[in-house]
């Protein structure tokens, strides 16, 4: 419970700060060149697409402004004509606040893993998940 209160406190402090906008830069394999990337606002009852771009030179970039930190999902469609087959969609979720955020793809294993840096809200969320992981592990044993 105290972790939830801590997260709520951090989010309220961050939301009171002046927001000049965010920049989200993604670094991905160059093999994904030209693939469409969508930014989805995912913290509402109805997720919706708010921006899109294409991968160029192994990178994609979104810029915008949120009044408060928002939970978003990035969807990369490896086959733009097939947006239903899960194996042809790469996605990851993150908090975006008014900072420069970078998402770097590590595709050395079977599935791509994104390392997120630059977002204070995302860092706090990752710390929170790390703190509750032992409780989740204990719960799954019972």
Each model region followed by its residue ranges:
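Sec-dependent N-terminal signal peptides
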Residues: 3-13
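A non-transmembrane, solvent-exposed segment enriched in polar/low-complexity residues
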Residues: 16-142
């Amino acid at each position: 419970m105290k972790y939830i209160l801590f997260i709520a406190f951090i989010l309220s402090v961050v939301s009171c700060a002046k927001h000049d906008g965010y920049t989200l830069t993604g670094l991905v394999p160059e093999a994904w060149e030209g693939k469409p990337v969508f930014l989805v606002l995912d913290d509402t009852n109805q997720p919706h697409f708010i921006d899109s771009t294409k991968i160029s030179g192994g990178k994609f970039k979104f810029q915008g402004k949120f009044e408060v930190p928002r939970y978003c999902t990035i969807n990369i469609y490896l086959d733009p004509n097939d947006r239903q087959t899960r194996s042809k969609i790469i996605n990851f979720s993150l908090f975006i606040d008014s900072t420069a955020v970078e998402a770097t793809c590590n595709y050395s294993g079977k599935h791509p893993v994104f390392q997120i840096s630059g977002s204070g809200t995302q860092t706090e969320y990752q710390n929170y998940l790390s703190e509750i992981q032992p409780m989740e592990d204990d719960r799954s044993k019972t």
